[in-house]
């Protein structure tokens, strides 16, 4: 079982552009939990920056991003997620979204938390700032 399972107890699969993928597919990767929402102006500004970083580096640096949406209706979620190249926690996992926010002390969005998928260890809590300051990922995965 993946170390992520302790944070995502109700989720066995995540959404992807091609359907669904299992949590187990993230073994060996660094995972960013991206807390965001379509109604959030700073999120709409940061998402393209993160998407560019993702497209340039996710294969070579062996990471994945998982959207943890704070959208309140499913249509907004799907419209927003449709613009993203990464994975997402399914919209119907609202209780998991709430628990993740509490677990990581997320009080505002956008927030990007870095986790070791195998162990569940938190690598960093300031990844949003690091993506902006280090767009080449020279110091990735930016431990706190």
Swiss-Prot record:
One of its GO terms (biological process) is negative regulation of protein ubiquitination. GO terms for molecular function: thioredoxin-disulfide reductase (NADPH) activity. Keywords: Disulfide bond, Electron transport, Redox-active center, Transport. Disulfide bonds join 40-43. One of its GO terms (cellular component) is nucleus. InterPro entries: Thioredoxin-like_fold, Thioredoxin-like_sf, Thioredoxin_CS, Thioredoxin_domain, TryX_NRX_thioredoxin_dom. Pfam families: Thioredoxin_8 (PF13905). Residues 2-144 form the Thioredoxin domain. Belongs to the thioredoxin family. Acts as a thiol-disulfide oxidoreductase. It is spontaneously reduced by trypanothione. This is Tryparedoxin.
